[in-house]
């Protein structure tokens, strides 16, 4: 029962109420198991709004609206608790507490003892007292039945009976709250026998005026004294004590006292009735701070809340936060008192409030689901046509918190200890009242009010960059093209896609590639197609080489053409709003460039390569390449080219029809073509017959200058009556062989090989692909490796893809310094129908640059050349190509002394084309009976490969998510001796056999040195876990993955973190990249935010690699 708070401290007798101090243990037992008073001398937070609710609950009526408001009274007061006294009402035995408070203007000015007491208040625990509580029944309150005590309670609380007596009985004495002694006779009798309190019980019931529904409790204190208390059921009182003021007077009294004390920093007294109050309104300061500023709230968040049950028990009920708003926005604005709206999971016998205060609940900050986290479940294949824009955790967060945008469900990468995303209570209330409209939904610009450490790094204008699981989560994959596009590119990509129906620009086609149609082999066109989606192509044309580069850059598409002297600079900028003009402009620009080339051609081939070209390639390296096509033609003499910038004005209007412009361009190109040897023509015929296009027609234009390269096999050709001359470089798919020493690099999707300038890294990045499902294109891409006099060779393998791209990488110089930074890479195609086909020359003189690089489109494996040799057990073959260039390069340094000296994945790249191929040439059978009748002459026998041949690749190179479901993966123990391949010009003999190499997988544990293990040594998960636990000294703690503790997870090729043991062992061996042992804290962080940021495997290599140096011999 509450009383008004006067301005003074008052006496201990409760200001005329006759209350007495009571036993502390009995007071807490009567108050309830959830009640806890802050210690004297500590800081507390006082809520006048809650105090007013207690008055209304005591009077069984709501607060009168006529009560005056006190605008100068804040919704909460931080005070020092000078004194606290536990009291009990002499009439009703209801317990309450009297507290003397004094407001504090500045918490930092409090002495250390006060702050320490506040901290201790949060940690203090009250010792559990043995007690027994029972709700009285009608028979218990009758005058003749006595009080029945449950057997276990009687044996635990009451003294032992003397069972030698018949019936067993004893006399009990118990003291009440007011230190009155009550005597009862305890007897064990009845049928069945039970413990009863008989004599003296009726006196106690009548004296306390107990009714059915009230509760009686017995406890034993620290002195083993038996204490007796009562709890009255909440019922409408028939009369009120004369000492109790009217409801309005009490409301005015407590508010006036609090306002006066806040204005003058004076002491005031309040009374707290735990049985009448709906919630505690005097909260320890540390508890308040932790609840309001330490918890991140979000709508839909789950929570627990403790409730008192019958007979003084407790139980947690689960609920969901449905809203955060002021309980009384008029009188108590921005108040934290019961400002959380909740919905409960289940019904309860007692009525539960729909509004609670934050310090009353326990937010569930770890996972939003009851069942095991999907982060650690086995991977399942995505259904066809389903977008992978969001991860499972993204979906869970969005469903749980639909009130915020996608950005807030992320984690700040710079903050390693970020907690569950959301806003704390103070931020919620500030946002609501800073908005012009009440109840306004959270706006993105307000999210920068996140508390704690993240607030220093968040920018409201760039939340998508600041708050994230991982950068790859922020990328939205375009469904049609399966390419990662930033949101700003989506609109531009749609506009660029409208340019397609017209013939395309010089050296560049902005086409959303789909599929290809069969092209008539008799209609050979000069075709260069390059899919560019929302990107910026830079077309560099040093004469006589043509370099077409595709760069991803916003906000506009710029076409730059570099030609020879005179240095004319004209920039052609393709405007998105003029799609119909772009094609005309580029075609016309192509004609003008060709005419300029014809005028300046004669003496260009003998000029020097300037530093400008080298510098320009260094700048190109800084951009994100989508596709680059490079081609050069070299005569026997050293070719060094002087580039000149020639550009076109994209805004030029042209009246020339697309078809006519194309024909003129083709005619202009014809005089520029050099003679091609018979071997090259044979190879050309062979390639264009092997490649069988099967997709929708697209219009393309080819710009060639002595040598042209294709970057896309999906083309349609315009009819022409021109007879193809022997000196023209052409192919149905655009696969064109240069007439002299050149490196051909074929890569999957849109990989790029930067050769000009020698400064580009060959790596695979996220690139456009025209299919989101395994390709049905049945075009096998045949790769021919042409030897080059350069000492540095490039090696790539490719297969049939939805977009096959051929990069003609020129060897610009013969005897100048070798290229230093071009990556040696093996590209693995993203299809289920064709496996890596052949090898090619790779340029790499810098073993420190080797590393493993994976992407969503292809997997590239870089082979280290640090030891000067590689070994791989691909069978040898007699695929000779050395004589291809014998006529065109009479002074070539190549001399075949041993077929194995020029092996590349078991392929003799210096052999003659006409000799039969070994059946094990290709990793995939691309030349079966399907193409037998299409190959001319003896070329039929050159491309027969067995379907049974599947080369042994690394078990960690490809996962099934790349669509290569039928490829066999074993160890990478290999035996290819490529010392002559790496040193071809030295004419040295083959090096000695090297030690066989094996795979290994790194295992990491925070705070311990990483270990490496051979996955193939183990037969199953149990053996693996036992060995890993032994290595790191955690034996027996990796067994049960469903309980909290150490977890063994691994990362696959898509960089997904999965639980070890969920997938079949064979699948695990194929796709594991690295293994990590998670501590319980790391597991919790993983469950909360789905990512470790930069702390999870930072810059770590994976299976079959060590910091970018694959296939290195290691041991445990």
Swiss-Prot record:
User: Which terms does the record give in the GO molecular function aspect?
Assistant: DNA binding
Q: Which residues bind DNA?
A: 132-234
Low complexity: compositionally biased ranges = 768-780
Query: Could you say which tissues express the protein in this record?
Result: Expressed in roots, culms, leaves and young panicles.
| The keyword Chloroplast is assigned to this record | no
Q: Where is this region: Disordered?
A: 763-812
Q: What are the Polar residues biased-composition ranges?
A: 781-806
Q: Which UniProt keywords apply?
A: Auxin signaling pathway, DNA-binding, Nucleus, Transcription, Transcription regulation
User: What Gene Ontology terms describe where this protein resides (cellular component)?
Assistant: nucleus
Q: Does the keyword Kinase apply?
A: no
The organism sits in which domain of life? Eukaryota
Q: What induces it?
A: By auxin under dark condition. Down-regulated by auxin under light condition.
Give the PB1 domain ranges.
Answer: 998-1082
Q: Where in the cell is it found?
A: Nucleus
Domain comment from the record reads as follows: Interactions between auxin response factors (ARFs) and Aux/IAA proteins occur through their C-terminal dimerization domains III and IV.
**What functional role does this protein have?**
Auxin response factors (ARFs) are transcriptional factors that bind specifically to the DNA sequence 5'-TGTCTC-3' found in the auxin-responsive promoter elements (AuxREs).
Q: Know the name of this protein? A: Auxin response factor 21
GN (gene name): ARF21
């Amino acid at each position: 029962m509450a009383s008004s708070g006067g301005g003074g401290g008052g006496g201990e007798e409760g200001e005329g109420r006759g209350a007495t101090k009571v036993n502390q243990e009995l007071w807490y037992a009567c108050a309830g198991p959830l009640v806890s008073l802050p210690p004297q001398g500590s800081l507390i937070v006082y809520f006048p709004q809650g105090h007013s609710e207690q008055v209304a609950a005591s009077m069984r009526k709501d607060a009168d609206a006529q009560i005056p408001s006190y605008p100068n009274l804040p919704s909460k007061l931080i005070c020092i608790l000078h004194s606290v006294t536990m009291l009990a009402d002499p009439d009703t035995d209801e317990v309450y507490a009297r507290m003397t408070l004094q407001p504090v203007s500045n918490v930092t000015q409090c002495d250390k003892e006060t702050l320490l007491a506040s901290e201790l208040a949060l940690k203090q625990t009250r010792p559990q007292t043995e007690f027994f509580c029972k709700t009285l029944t009608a028979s218990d309150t009758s005058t003749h039945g006595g009080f029945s005590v449950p057997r276990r309670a009687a044996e635990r609380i009451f003294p032992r009976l003397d069972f030698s007596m018949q019936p067993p009985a004893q006399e009990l004495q118990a003291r009440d709250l007011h230190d009155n002694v009550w005597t009862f006779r305890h007897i064990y009798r009845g049928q069945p026998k039970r413990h009863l309190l008989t004599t003296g019980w009726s006196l106690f019931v009548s004296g306390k005026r107990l009714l059915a529904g009230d509760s009686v409790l017995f406890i034993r204190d620290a002195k083993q004294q038996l204490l007796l208390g009562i709890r009255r059921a909440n019922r409408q009182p028939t009369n009120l004590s004369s000492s109790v003021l009217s409801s309005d007077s009490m409301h005015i009294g407590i508010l006036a006292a609090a306002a006066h004390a806040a204005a003058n920093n004076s002491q005031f007294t309040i009374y707290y009735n735990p049985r009448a109050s709906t919630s505690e309104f005097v909260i320890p300061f540390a508890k308040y701070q932790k609840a309001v500023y330490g918890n991140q709230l979000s709508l839909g968040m789950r929570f627990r809340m403790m409730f008192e049950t019958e007979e003084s028990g407790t139980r947690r009920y689960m609920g969901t936060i449905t809203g955060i708003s002021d309980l009384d926005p008029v009188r108590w604005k921005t108040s934290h008192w019961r400002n959380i709206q909740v919905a409960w999971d289940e019904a309860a016998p007692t009525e539960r409030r729909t509004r609670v205060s934050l310090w009353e609940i326990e937010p569930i900050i770890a996972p939003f689901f009851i069942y095991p986290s999907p982060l650690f479940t086995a991977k399942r294949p995505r259904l066809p046509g389903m977008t992978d824009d969001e991860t499972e955790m993204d979906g869970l967060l969005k469903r749980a918190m639909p009130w915020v945008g996608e950005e807030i469900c992320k984690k700040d990468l710079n903050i390693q200890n970020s907690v569950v995303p959301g806003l704390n209570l103070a931020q919620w209330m500030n946002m609501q009242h800073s908005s012009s409209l009440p109840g306004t939904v959270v706006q993105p610009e307000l999210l920068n009010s996140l508390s704690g450490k993240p607030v220093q790094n968040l920018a409201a204008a760039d939340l998508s960059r600041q708050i994230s699981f991982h950068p790859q989560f922020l990328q939205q994959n375009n469904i049609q093209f399966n390419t990662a596009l930033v949101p700003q590119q989506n609109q531009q990509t749609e506009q660029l896609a409208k340019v397609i129906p017209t013939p395309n620009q010089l050296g560049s086609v902005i086409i959303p590639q789909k599929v290809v149609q069969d092209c008539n082999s008799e209609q050979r066109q000069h075709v260069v197609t390059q899919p560019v989606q929302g990107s910026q192509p830079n077309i560099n044309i040093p004469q006589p080489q043509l370099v077409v580069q595709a760069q991803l850059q916003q906000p506009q598409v710029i076409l730059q053409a570099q030609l020879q002297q005179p240095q004319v600079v004209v920039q052609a900028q393709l405007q998105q709003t003029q799609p119909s003009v772009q094609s005309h402009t580029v075609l016309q620009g192509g004609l003008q460039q060709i005419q300029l080339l014809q005028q300046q051609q004669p003496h260009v081939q003998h000029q020097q390569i300037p530093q400008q070209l080298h510098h320009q390639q260094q700048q190109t390296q800084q951009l994100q390449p989508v596709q680059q096509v490079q081609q050069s033609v070299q005569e026997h003499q050293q070719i060094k080219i002087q580039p000149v910038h020639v550009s076109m004005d994209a805004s030029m209007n042209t009246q020339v029809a697309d078809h006519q412009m194309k024909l003129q361009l083709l005619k202009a190109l014809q005089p520029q073509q050099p003679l091609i040897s018979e071997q090259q023509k044979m190879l050309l015929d062979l390639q264009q017959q092997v490649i069988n296009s099967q997709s929708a027609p697209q219009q393309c234009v080819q710009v060639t200058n002595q040598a042209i390269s294709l970057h896309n096999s999906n083309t349609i050709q315009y009819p022409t009556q021109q007879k193809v001359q022997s000196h023209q470089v052409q192919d149905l798919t655009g696969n064109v062989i240069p007439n002299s020493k050149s490196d051909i690099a074929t890569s999957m999707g849109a990989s790029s090989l930067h050769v000009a300038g020698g400064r580009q890294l060959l790596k695979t990045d996220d690139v456009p692909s025209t299919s989101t499902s395994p390709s049905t294109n049945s075009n096998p891409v045949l790769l021919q490796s042409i030897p080059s006099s350069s000492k540095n060779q490039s090696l790539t393998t490719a297969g049939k893809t939805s977009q096959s791209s051929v990069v003609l990488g020129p060897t610009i110089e013969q005897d100048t310094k070798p290229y230093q930074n071009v990556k040696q890479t093996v590209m693995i195609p993203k299809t289920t129908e064709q496996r890596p086909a052949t090898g090619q020359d790779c340029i790499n003189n810098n073993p420190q640059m080797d590393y493993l690089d994976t992407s969503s489109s292809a997997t590239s494996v870089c082979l280290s050349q640090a030891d000067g040799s590689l070994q791989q057990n691909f069978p040898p073959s007699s695929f000779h190509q050395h004589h291809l260039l014998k006529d065109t390069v009479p002074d070539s340094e190549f001399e075949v002394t041993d077929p194995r000296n020029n092996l590349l994945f078991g392929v003799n790249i210096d052999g003659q084309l006409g000799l039969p191929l070994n059946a094990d040439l290709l990793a995939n059978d691309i030349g079966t009976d399907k193409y037998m009748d299409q190959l001319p002459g003896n070329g039929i026998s050159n491309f027969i490969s067995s379907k049974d041949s599947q080369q042994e690749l690394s078990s960690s190179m490809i996962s099934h998510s790349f669509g290569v479901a039928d490829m066999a993966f074993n160890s990478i123990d290999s035996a290819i001796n490529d010392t002559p391949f790496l040193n071809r010009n030295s004419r040295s003999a083959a090096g000695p056999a090297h030690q066989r190499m094996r795979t290994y997988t790194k295992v990491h544990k925070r705070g311990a040195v990483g270990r490496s293990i051979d996955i193939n040594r183990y037969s199953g998960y149990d053996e693996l876990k036992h060995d890993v636990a032994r290595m790191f000294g955690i034996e027996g703690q990796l067994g049960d993955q469903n309980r909290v503790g150490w977890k063994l997870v691994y990362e696959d090729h898509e960089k997904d973190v999965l639980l070890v043991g969920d997938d079949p062992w064979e699948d695990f061996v194929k796709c594991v990249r690295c293994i990590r042992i998670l501590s319980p804290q790391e597991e919790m962080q993983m469950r909360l935010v789905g990512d470790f940021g930069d702390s999870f495997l930072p810059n770590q290599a994976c299976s079959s690699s060590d910091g970018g140096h694959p296939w290195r011999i290691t041991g445990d």
